Amino acid sequence: MKKIIKGLLLISVICLLCACRNNKNTESKITLDSNGFLTKEAIKNIQTEDDYIILDVRTKEEYVEKHIVDSILIPYDEISAKTINIDKNKIILVYCRSGRRASTAVEKLKDLGYTAYNMGGIDNINLPKE
């Protein structure tokens, strides 16, 4: 009986250590700068490891002028449960011109149950644009 209890205790400790290690990896790849924007390293980490989309929350005119390759456009004032048809398992990386509208959009998305992060302004994001 003592061997069974010791074995179960050992398995529990191993599971706990693995769970803590995975949590640290997730936390370490999501880092924000002093403005609350994702760091360049965090964006790179998310892109290589996770299922994500890039969301542009500027106006249609701004999007047509210049946008990040493969981003989708949903103006920040149009974000609602009715207009968003994005898988809730995806991480949403949000940007605008300066980061202000993206901040509002991130809060709306979080309220709707999404995992979303503010990338900041388009000119400060080191990703291909078209």
For the regions a language model picked out, list residue spans one by one.
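Rhodanese-like catalytic fold shared by cysteine-dependent sulfurtransferases
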Residues: K2-L8, L16, C20-K40, Y52, ...
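A short acidic-Thr-Gly-centered motif at the start of a beta-strand
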Residues: I43-D50
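Structural scaffold elements adjacent to functional motifs in cytosolic proteins
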Residues: I54-D56
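Short, surface-exposed ligand- or partner-binding patches at beta-edge/loop junctions that are enriched
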Residues: Y95-C96
